[in-house]
């Protein structure tokens, strides 16, 4: 019987070309700088501190150039607590605490941040795009040393702004942190095993119409793209009722329901696509004119025009930057 399944090697599909000076270079000539992120301890952040953290992220993102992708990735992996029982000098309470929590399950949280410099053509690429449609393979931005230098300077400024806060700490990942060493695996190893182990075995990856599987892990992807699934209002943090009282508030981040409150192995991804804001606003202006011309045929067109006009008025008066965003949660069972 003939096997019609398509089998290929990881080397042929691997999107990275090389790692140069601590930066990941893709086969499409995108440059990515990776960071390890340290966040405050859970349930210790106040509402004012959440606001300060949000302001720091906002300030840092605004220094990045156009056609930059900000990707924050939160890994939540189920583990069992392993205390260091053999440590000497522990007090009676410390030893009792270690025995109490020994082997208890918990979600291990690790955070990574990726800043990618791409180009306008890549940012707007669709599935029907072909390299035969352009006269050169490499984008001109990657061959312009000045553009690369400006991006790296913006990354340095981004890192300084975040590290100036008291709550967040960024650590730039080096080549050995990404690809690993003979003794310890790197970040790229985790994608092939979905494991925290130092040197996990390489697993087969199956991409099918009905499922995606890495080794024994079956993956389920959920995207936050439908407006009906989004809340009517947003904030930096929310009150966690289970640990709050009449006299005290326990605050969690607004995205906690798809993050640490999701009791399974999962990866929560947040993408921000920074494009030319002026071009985006002009596109909204054109869309508003189209809605106005079609308002006589449908009341929904009239309502959409009012919403677009309201956004444009606020964006122009307050200097807002129009970006695109995408959020998804990758659950593995």
What are these regions (language model features)?
Residues 1-331:
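Extended, folded cores of ATP/NTP-driven motor/assembly subunits in large transport
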């Amino acid at each position: 019987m003939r096997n019609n399944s398509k089998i290929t090697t990881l080397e042929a599909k691997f999107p990275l070309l090389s790692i140069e000076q601590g930066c990941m270079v893709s086969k499409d000539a995108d440059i990515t700088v990776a960071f390890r992120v340290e966040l405050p301890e859970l349930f210790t952040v106040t509402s004012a501190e959440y606001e300060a953290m949000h302001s720091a992220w906002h300030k840092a993102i605004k220094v990045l150039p156009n056609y930059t992708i900000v990707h924050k990735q939160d890994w939540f992996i189920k583990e069992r607590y392993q205390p260091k029982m053999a440590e000497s000098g522990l007090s009676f309470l410390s030893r009792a605490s270690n025995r109490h929590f020994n082997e208890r399950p918990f979600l291990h949280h690790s955070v990574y941040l990726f800043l990618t410099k791409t180009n306008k053509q890549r940012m707007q690429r669709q599935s029907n795009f072909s390299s035969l449609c352009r006269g050169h393979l490499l984008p001109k931005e990657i061959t312009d040393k000045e553009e690369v230098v400006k991006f790296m300077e913006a990354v340095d400024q981004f890192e300084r702004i975040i590290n100036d806060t008291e709550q967040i700490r960024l650590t730039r990942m080096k080549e050995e942190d990404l690809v690993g060493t003979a003794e310890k695996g790197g970040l790229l190893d985790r994608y092939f095993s979905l494991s925290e182990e130092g040197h996990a075995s390489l697993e087969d990856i199956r991409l099918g119409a009905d499922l995606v599987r890495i080794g024994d892990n079956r993956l389920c992807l959920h995207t936050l793209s439908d407006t009906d699934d989004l809340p009517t209002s947003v904030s930096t943090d929310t009150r966690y009722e289970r640990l709050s009282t009449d006299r005290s508030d326990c605050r969690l981040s607004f995205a906690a329901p798809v993050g640490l409150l999701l009791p399974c192995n999962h990866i929560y991804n947040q993408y921000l696509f920074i494009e030319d804001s002026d071009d985006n606003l002009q596109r909204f202006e054109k869309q508003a004119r189209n809605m106005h011309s079609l308002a006589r045929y449908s009341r929904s067109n009239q309502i959409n025009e009012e919403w677009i006009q309201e956004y444009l008025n606020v964006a122009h008066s307050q200097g807002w930057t129009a970006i695109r965003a995408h959020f998804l949660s990758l659950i593995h069972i």
